[in-house]
């Protein structure tokens, strides 16, 4: 961690700036949390979306959701106060979670690209290649690697420079410290190499998909199935494209920090590229809805069911109140005493003593 340093001058004043940034960050956090919750609900409640491919999408959504719950609120507090308001131990946990969730996002997207490659290039053998057991092993692999690369390296100090931190528990800065080796290894292994493989994979997917579309143009049933696969591929490629746009600047700065040191990077620019990367977690649910019809349908059904249930509840309440008012208006002020019939749980009927009335 970077524990030393002073508060930047731009953080001292500018109330309007802080209010504007606060609104933007709050909206980003809310969209991230709500959007990824909806993705998980949509897959869980819609049978059409319960596929092996969507297991990786749910894993990605869970990753983004955890980022929105465990990292972004503290990042926003740190961004607005321009100092770390918590302990040094919690700083280590916070930065480890940040690195872990970022790595998990990359590996989920990497697995998604491999899944799409198998589905498009060899659809007949896809059920044999992509089995529930292999998907489960892949998900375990993703999270084990992510935890190892984050918590292990940071808590063992593999990323630290030859700087001694203060012994007290109060710190000003809290961000991942980067040395030359850690910057290059982490940047290459967790971002640039997976990114290169994903780009090659998607290029081959689109090339083969175009050839297949021409070859099966006159076969109706295969055409419908292939079009569905191609639409899913386009959607997931758009998700990966958004990931590149959002995270490529950050990892470039990350590697540059490792080579040149923290003083070589402007802090404002570093904050901008960091939050640009965080914004990717809010974009994925929007991309699903915009580019995938199955997810659009699931979202529509989810919100319509909630709205219909709410309207039905309100209508029922109004109807019951109306009937109650009508019965009260028609009821005489006094009634003859008559036997009161009481239904008990066993289904038998009990007659109340004479003098009990229906009230």
Curated annotation (Swiss-Prot):
What membrane topology term does the record carry? Multi-pass membrane protein
Ranges per topology, Extracellular: 1-22, 82-92, 160-180, 259-267
Lipid anchor positions (S-palmitoyl cysteine): 305
Q: Check the record and name the PROSITE patterns matching this protein.
A: G_PROTEIN_RECEP_F1_1 (PS00237), G_PROTEIN_RECEP_F1_2 (PS50262)
Please provide the record's keywords in A-Z order. Cell membrane, Disulfide bond, G-protein coupled receptor, Glycoprotein, Lipoprotein, Membrane, Palmitate, Receptor, Transducer, Transmembrane, Transmembrane helix
What does the UniProt entry say about where the protein is found? Answer: Cell membrane
Report the glycosylation sites. Answer: 4
A GO MF annotation of the entry reads: histamine receptor activity
Q: List the disulfide bonds.
A: 91-174
**Site positions per UniProt: Implicated in histamine binding:** 190
Q: Which SMART domains does this entry report, sorted A to Z?
A: 7TM_GPCR_Srsx
**Origin, by domain of life?**
Eukaryota
* Gene Ontology biological process: chemical synaptic transmission; G protein-coupled receptor signaling pathway, coupled to cyclic nucleotide second messenger; gastric acid secretion; positive regulation of vasoconstriction
Purpose of the protein: The H2 subclass of histamine receptors mediates gastric acid secretion. The activity of this receptor is mediated by G proteins which activate adenylyl cyclase.
Q: Which PANTHER family match?
A: 5-HYDROXYTRYPTAMINE RECEPTOR, HISTAMINE H2 RECEPTOR
Which family does the UniProt entry place this protein in? Belongs to the G-protein coupled receptor 1 family.
Q: What is the name attached to this protein's record?
A: Histamine H2 receptor
Q: What is the lineage of its organism?
A: Eukaryota, Metazoa, Chordata, Craniata, Vertebrata
């Amino acid at each position: 961690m970077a524990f030393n340093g002073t508060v930047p001058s731009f953080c001292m004043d500018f109330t309007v700036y802080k209010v504007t940034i606060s609104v933007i960050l709050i909206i980003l956090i809310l969209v991230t949390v709500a959007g990824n919750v909806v993705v998980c609900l949509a897959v869980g409640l819609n049978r059409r979306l319960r596929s092996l491919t969507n297991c990786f999408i749910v894993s990605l959504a869970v990753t983004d959701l955890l980022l929105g719950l465990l990292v972004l609120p503290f990042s926003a507090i740190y961004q607005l106060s321009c100092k770390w308001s918590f302990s040094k131990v919690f700083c280590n946990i916070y930065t480890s979670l940040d690195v872990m969730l970022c790595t998990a996002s990359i590996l989920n997207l990497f697995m998604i690209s491999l899944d799409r490659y198998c589905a498009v290039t060899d659809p007949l053998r896809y059920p044999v290649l992509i089995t529930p057991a292999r998907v489960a092993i892949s998900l375990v692999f993703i999270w084990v690697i992510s935890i190892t690369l984050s918590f292990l390296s940071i808590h063992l100090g593999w990323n630290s420079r030859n700087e001694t931190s203060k012994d007290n528990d109060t710190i000003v800065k809290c961000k991942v410290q980067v040395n030359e080796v850690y910057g290059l290894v982490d940047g290459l292994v967790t971002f640039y190499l997976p990114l290169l493989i994903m780009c090659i994979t998607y290029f081959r997917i689109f090339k083969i998909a175009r050839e297949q579309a021409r070859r099966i143009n006159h076969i109706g049933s295969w055409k419908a199935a292939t079009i569905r696969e191609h639409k899913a591929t386009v959607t997931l490629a758009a998700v990966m494209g958004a990931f590149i746009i959002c995270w490529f600047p950050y990892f470039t700065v990350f590697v540059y920090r490792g080579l040149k040191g923290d003083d070589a990077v402007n802090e404002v620019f570093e904050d901008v590229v960091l939050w640009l990367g965080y914004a990717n977690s809010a974009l994925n649910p929007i991309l699903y809805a915009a580019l995938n019809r199955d997810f659009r349908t699931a979202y529509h059904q989810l919100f319509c069911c909630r709205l219909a249930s709410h309207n039905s509840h309100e209508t029922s309440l109004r109807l019951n109140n109306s009937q109650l008012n009508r019965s009260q208006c028609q009821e005489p002020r006094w009634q003859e005493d008559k036997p009161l019939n009481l239904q008990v749980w066993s289904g038998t009927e009990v007659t109340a003593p004479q003098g009990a009335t229906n009230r």
